[in-house]
Amino acid sequence: MRSNNNNPLTRDEILSRYFPQYRPAVAASQGLSGGSCIIAHDTHRVVLRRHHDPDAPPAHFLRHYRALSQLPASLAPRALFYTPGWMAVEYLHGVVNSALPDADELAALLYHLHQQPRFGWRIALSPLLAQYWSCCDPARRTPFWLRRLKQLQKNGEPRPLRLAPLHMDVHGDNIVLTSAGLRLIDWEYAGDGDIALELAAVWVEDERQHRQLADAYAARARIDARQLWRQIRLWHPWVIMLKAGWFEYRWRQTGEQQFIRLADETWRQLRMKG
């Protein structure tokens, strides 16, 4: 049975209707947010995810489920169940480390993803940046932010080097080291786009780590390393604005202080770079 989007089922209703033998096991964990939880029956665990963004259309949540349905088990957890507002996915047993894997391992994982068939929907950053501007706290809108936004919109997004399915939220907490190797979780922002955009968006510690990843990927993908790095740098202003806007967006939604601190730090980085 599919619930009404205007009156979504509660977690307890989902459990009683679709998972009567399961009980909540862990309230929150790495890669989980917005009311998601782990449910368990004996030793079997499932991740129950909730559509937690009130400003995102239900179609975006459905895309998340469809992305997981398309991906092989060598990359992502299996999609198990969907009803409007909720999905259930396989729980991956393994180790989550806040630090990224080494460059060669991560490059291999991303290259494997980028070799898969495309999802069927493109990632478009310009309208997303505009949405973050319009949905943020009006008191946080600054002339600097507006100038940067208009400049990016005027320039347009870089021409893709190679189009592929992207994860678009690659950081240590979204990578699980399982007994079968590395897997990516939390595919909320997945879509088709430039491989260099994916690499530009990885949450690296510094430029040295970024260059190591780019060089390792270029070697595996047989791309000229200098050409790939130039393309990554073209995407860099877009990615920094994307992160700043997302922090502002989440601050407006949640009021959590961590987001305003991260937003302030990202704006400082942007101002320092002109």
From Swiss-Prot:
It is an enzyme of class 2 (transferase). One of its GO terms (molecular function) is thiamine kinase activity. Keywords: ATP-binding, Kinase, Nucleotide-binding, Transferase. The keyword Secreted does not apply. It comes from the Bacteria. InterPro entries: Aminoglycoside_PTrfase, Kinase-like_dom_sf, Thiamine_kinase. It catalyses: thiamine + ATP = thiamine phosphate + ADP + H(+). One of its GO terms (biological process) is thiamine diphosphate biosynthetic process. The keyword Kinase applies. Its EC number is 2.7.1.89. Pathway: Cofactor biosynthesis; thiamine diphosphate biosynthesis; thiamine phosphate from thiamine: step 1/1. Belongs to the thiamine kinase family. Catalyzes the ATP-dependent phosphorylation of thiamine to thiamine phosphate. Is involved in thiamine salvage. NCBIfam families: PRK10271.1 (NF007620), ycfN_thiK (TIGR02721). This is Thiamine kinase. The lineage of its organism: Bacteria, Pseudomonadati, Pseudomonadota, Gammaproteobacteria, Enterobacterales.
